[in-house]
Amino acid sequence: MTATAAVLLDAEAHPVIAHRGASAFAPENTLVGFERAAAFGAEAFELDVHVTADDQPVVIHDPTLDRTTDRRGVVRLMPYAAFRDADAGARFTTDRGATFPFQGLGVRVPLLAEVLGMFAETPFIVEIKAVAAAQAVKRVITESGAMSRCVVASFDERALAPFDAPPWIRSASRAETLSLLSRALVGRAARPSRYRALAIPTRFNGIPIPMRMLAGAARRIGCPTHVWVIDSPEVAMSLWKQGVAGVITNRPGAMLAARDAGAAE
């Protein structure tokens, strides 16, 4: 059976989506982090993509290597070969720097193609972090045969423009999300949209999002709402009760346990 993004497009489902992998337990946006998420039973993965100087989409959140590896430099200005062997486990710690359990273990910044290939049955939210990466991401998803299981996301509508037409699946940009919310606040119906899901934080510019209202407006046009980053089981349960579909979390095991316990009550 061909894997699809169905669980990410069903407003009635409550998927647990691993944020950059199981990033409370392993380095974010790495193969080992995604392996840990799979072991916990996460039903989809969220990841971030930048593009290198030689047009290779790589899975990393920041525009630079500085925070998550033992190297420094701007990803967009370097060919992948220049940092292929950077240690992406060097800075990961769960005890405020007392230990670095993944340092020196060969953890690397992976190519998007590697992640899609290794987890060929997993749905993904692929967040494009820079407009310059959009075409390269489109190429790699196409070459990987992963179009049906990827929801492409970005804050920037320009990065999403290449994914507007079917069979591509994309989420709402920040501007589209705010437009949906503003119309809901004044009781106006949503306009026809090119997006098929929302992927949002709990706050915009420090202001709490009226989640029940926004999720309800999205559901009326057939769009599920996925919320990040949720690491509290109590918050996850509250969001699900407000009509949110998925939670994007660093702790997929805890969220799955909370969801399943709630379903059994």
Where are these regions (language model features)?
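Hydrophobic faces of well-ordered beta-strands that scaffold small-molecule active sites
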Residues: V16-H19, F45-L47, F124-V126, C150-A153, ...
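Solvent-exposed polar/charged
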Residues: A39, E43, G117-M118, K241
